[in-house]
Regions:
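Redox-cofactor binding/interface segments in oxidoreductases and associated redox assembly factors
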Residues: 29-31, 56, 208
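Short glycine-/acidic-enriched loop or helix-start segments at secondary-structure transitions
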Residues: 37-40, 64, 218
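Short alpha-helices
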Residues: 55-124
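Structural motif
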Residues: 25-28, 51-53, 205
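Active-site regions of enzymes building and remodeling cell-envelope glycoconjugates
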Residues: 4-9, 50-52, 65-70
Length: 221
């Protein structure tokens, strides 16, 4: 996506992120419902004098924040489009903005395979196409570009770590920190992995347990 190189990662530049948060007038928190989901950033977000706005589609948003929330939309990017178009009109959406919004809608719905049964979602995608969205380019960047270490990490998990309970329709994938380090894990390398076991007949629940530094992350589908 255009300008993604200008995004600042807390993992890579923590001091710069802290400075920006301290100097901010307003902080937007997208696709999570509480500041507690900020992880390592939480303390710095809370300490900032800036106002905080949550834009999210998950249930039970933090009532202490300014909240724009709708659990009926497919994704936060769908909600973001609605907010933007209501404030500035549809003409605010450039081809680059359309690409960014479609990327969020597509990835948050598993390629429009879940959480996307409402006609509104497809009407918004039509609006994005009219705004200049290059859908084929986005699909290629999301689904057809991999690095070798990511493929090997996913292959190892599916071959050696995936467990399916024969009594209950549950698949479990435990992933250790040592395995992440062995395959040079980078943020995003496990994106979508938790959905794969759901393609197995009779598996209704998929659980991914990922050991991170100082915490364990559980992902459910």
């Amino acid at each position: 996506m255009k300008n993604i190189s200008s995004a600042i990662s807390f993992q890579e530049k923590p001091e710069e992120c802290k400075r920006l948060l301290a100097d901010a007038d307003l902080i937007f928190m997208l696709d999570h419902n509480t500041v507690a989901r900020e992880g390592d950033l939480e303390n710095w977000v809370v300490a900032s004098p800036a106002g905080r706005v949550i834009i999210d589609h998950h249930p039970d948003p933090d009532p202490q924040q300014y909240v724009i929330s709708d659990t009926q939309v497919s994704s936060t990017c769908e909600l973001l489009y609605i907010v933007m178009s209501q404030i500035w009109g549809k003409e605010i959406v450039t081809p680059d903005i359309a690409g960014a919004l479609y990327t969020g809608i597509n990835t948050d719905t598993g390629g429009l395979s879940h959480n996307s049964s409402h006609p509104q979602t497809y009407r918004i995608i039509a609006d994005l196409l009219e705004a200049g969205l290059d859908k084929a380019y986005i699909h290629e960047r999301i689904y057809q570009m991999n690095n070798l270490s990511r493929l090997r990490l996913i292959g190892n998990v599916l071959l050696n770590k995936l467990e399916v309970n024969e009594q209950y329709p549950v698949a479990i994938m435990p992933i250790t920190r040592e395995e992440l380090d062995r395959y040079n894990y980078k943020d995003g390398d496990l994106e979508g992995l938790v959905n794969i076991p759901l393609s197995v007949h009779n598996v209704c629940v998929s659980v991914q347990i990922t050991e991170r530094r100082e915490r364990v992350k559980l992902s459910f589908r």
